[in-house]
């Protein structure tokens, strides 16, 4: 499938540049599973992968983690599939960062539930998603207390201001998610 070819090309190209997959190069996936979740199933029809339930999705991710040096999977299940998220985290969370974005929407109540149910081990933090800096910092503090990672992220349609890069450094999480250099009209966050 195109996605499989893209993963293979990504690894191959980095290895040609002298980096070793699984040592210096890792892949982080944003599955956005809610976007292909229909009527209680995950639909892969466009790529020829058929339809999968939550346990088949878990097997799919387990297989990917064996084949590729994956370090992080964002939104591996639908935003309402808390059980599915927990099963992925139980199976892969010891070796891979399982990030909740749509599951948590930077909301402390959802993160609290996720911590209680072991639904992930990391949260995507979008400052303008929850509304205030203080609410965002409270969510980050909750992650820290639980021993979870957090990834500061932009949201599509944001300005070219570099605040998000500065905020990521100030919060000390060590991770930021920004748009790709070649898709951004101005890649200031990456250059900051």
What are these regions (language model features)?
Residues 1-7, 11, 182-192:
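Single conserved hydrophobic/aromatic residue that forms the stacking wall/gate
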Residues 14-184, 188:
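Catalytic core of soluble alpha/beta enzymes
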């Amino acid at each position: 499938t195109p996605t499989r070819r893209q993963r293979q090309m990504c690894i191959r190209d980095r290895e040609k540049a002298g980096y070793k997959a699984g040592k210096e190069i890792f892949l982080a996936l944003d599955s956005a599973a809610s976007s292909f979740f229909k009527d209680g199933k995950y639909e892969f029809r466009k790529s020829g992968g058929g339809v999968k339930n939550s346990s088949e999705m878990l097997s799919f991710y387990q297989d990917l983690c064996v084949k590729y040096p994956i370090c992080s999977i964002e939104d591996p299940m639908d935003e309402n599939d808390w059980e599915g998220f927990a099963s992925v985290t139980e199976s892969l969370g010891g070796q891979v960062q399982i990030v909740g974005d749509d599951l948590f929407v930077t909301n402390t109540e959802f993160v609290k539930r996720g911590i209680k149910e072991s639904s992930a081990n990391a949260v995507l933090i979008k400052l303008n998603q929850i509304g205030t800096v203080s609410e965002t910092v409270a969510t980050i503090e909750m992650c820290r207390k639980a021993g979870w990672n957090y990834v500061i992220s932009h949201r599509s349609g944001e300005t070219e201001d570099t605040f998000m890069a500065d905020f990521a450094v100030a919060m000390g999480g060590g991770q930021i998610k920004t748009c790709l250099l070649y898709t951004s009209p101005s890649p200031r966050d990456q250059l900051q």
